Amino acid sequence: MADTNRAVEKLQGKFEASILEVKQDRGDWIVTVKKEDIVAVLAFLKQECKFDMLTDVTAVDYLGKAADRFMMVYQLTSVPFKDRLRIKAPVAEADCVIGSATQVYGSANWLEREVFDLFGIRFDKHPDLRRILMTPDWEGHPLRKDYPLQGPGREPYKGRLS
């Protein structure tokens, strides 16, 4: 599959009920899907559409701006066809769990651990979901928009910075 347009069309045909939005931004296709289908969508794109590389996994916190607080973002690349595709999935704060992409892309392992560590989003069936950047005893998730700027229970630094 050499053309992202055709990959998006195939995705729409196979996962019509799962797709929430399809749009283009600055030449890149962005497809938003229900979080319940993220693993199946990623597997389909890898196997059927040759998006063989997961370039990045991250999250966005839309505190107070969207019905679902978080948006998971997966950046895929087709190396043979030099194509990119972004897949997004909304995640509610009340049910802050999504399927793990490690079942499809092994490279998702540390990327998902980073999202868990910094945003608190859990990944179902992740092989080793634990903190990767913050210490194990760290309280909270520092990239959440409601996280205290000075950190939990920490005094502002009063020394010299230079």
Swiss-Prot record:
Its main location: membrane. It is found in: Cell inner membrane. It is a peripheral membrane protein. Its EC number is 7.1.1.-. Keywords: Cell inner membrane, Cell membrane, Membrane, NAD, Quinone, Translocase, Transport, Ubiquinone. It is an enzyme of class 7 (translocase). Gene3D superfamilies: NADH:ubiquinone oxidoreductase, 30kDa subunit. GO terms for cellular component: plasma membrane. GO terms for molecular function: NADH dehydrogenase (ubiquinone) activity; NADH:ubiquinone reductase (non-electrogenic) activity; quinone binding. The keyword Signal does not apply. It catalyses: a quinone + NADH + 5 H(+)(in) = a quinol + NAD(+) + 4 H(+)(out). It comes from the Bacteria. Belongs to the complex I 30 kDa subunit family. NDH-1 is composed of 14 different subunits. Subunits NuoB, C, D, E, F, and G constitute the peripheral sector of the complex. NDH-1 shuttles electrons from NADH, via FMN and iron-sulfur (Fe-S) centers, to quinones in the respiratory chain. The immediate electron acceptor for the enzyme in this species is believed to be ubiquinone. Couples the redox reaction to proton translocation (for every two electrons transferred, four hydrogen ions are translocated across the cytoplasmic membrane), and thus conserves the redox energy in a proton gradient. This is NADH-quinone oxidoreductase subunit C. It comes from Trichlorobacter lovleyi (strain ATCC BAA-1151 / DSM 17278 / SZ) (Geobacter lovleyi).
